[in-house]
């Protein structure tokens, strides 16, 4: 059974291609995820933006038609992107040897894939909003069965938070 160690003796690298038109948003989410890993283990993943800098286990993050490593994996048959092609805010996560791919159908899909990993390591979105501290762990290790996933399209296309500013209870 294939296992992927996110953080053990050291943390994995996270590769984001700077040529991806969604680079800025994806990088922000990847930095947040690296911070989450550090919060849980004390070891921070290194973000790399050049394929030549990758040394060892890596998380390759990007949108499906913008990241050359994701495109290469799809061409080789390692990664099946047909299930998210043309869909709204979807992602695929796939473990292949020492590479964990997170491929989004679009920028938001990719970001949701990154935050799914944060959820898997035990970090709540409330860590920032309400200081909910995650459980500390020495090692973060997952099997391919736990990591491999194809998300569904959201049932509501446009969603958000409405703040009632007519009678706010913020004071």
What are these regions (language model features)?
Residues 1-92, 146-147:
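Acidic, contiguous N-terminal accessory segments
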Residues 32, 79-171:
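Feature activates predominantly on carbohydrate-active enzymes
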């Amino acid at each position: 059974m294939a296992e992927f160690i996110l953080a053990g003796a050291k943390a994995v690298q996270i590769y984001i291609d700077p040529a991806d038109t969604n680079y800025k948003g994806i990088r922000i989410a990847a930095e947040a995820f690296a911070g989450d890993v550090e919060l849980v283990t004390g070891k921070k993943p290194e973000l790399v933006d050049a394929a030549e800098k990758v040394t060892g286990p890596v998380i390759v993050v990007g949108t499906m038609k913008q990241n050359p490593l994701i495109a290469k994996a799809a061409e080789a048959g390692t990664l099946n992107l047909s299930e998210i092609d043309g869909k709204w805010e979807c992602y695929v996560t796939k473990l292949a040897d020492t590479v964990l791919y997170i491929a989004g159908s679009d920028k938001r899909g990719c970001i949701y894939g990154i935050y799914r990993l944060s959820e898997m390591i035990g970090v709540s979105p409330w860590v920032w909003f309400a200081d909910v501290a995650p459980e500390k762990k020495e090692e973060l290790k997952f099997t391919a069965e736990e990591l491999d996933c194809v998300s569904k399209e959201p049932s509501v296309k446009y969603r958000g938070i409405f703040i009632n500013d007519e009678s706010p209870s913020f004071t």
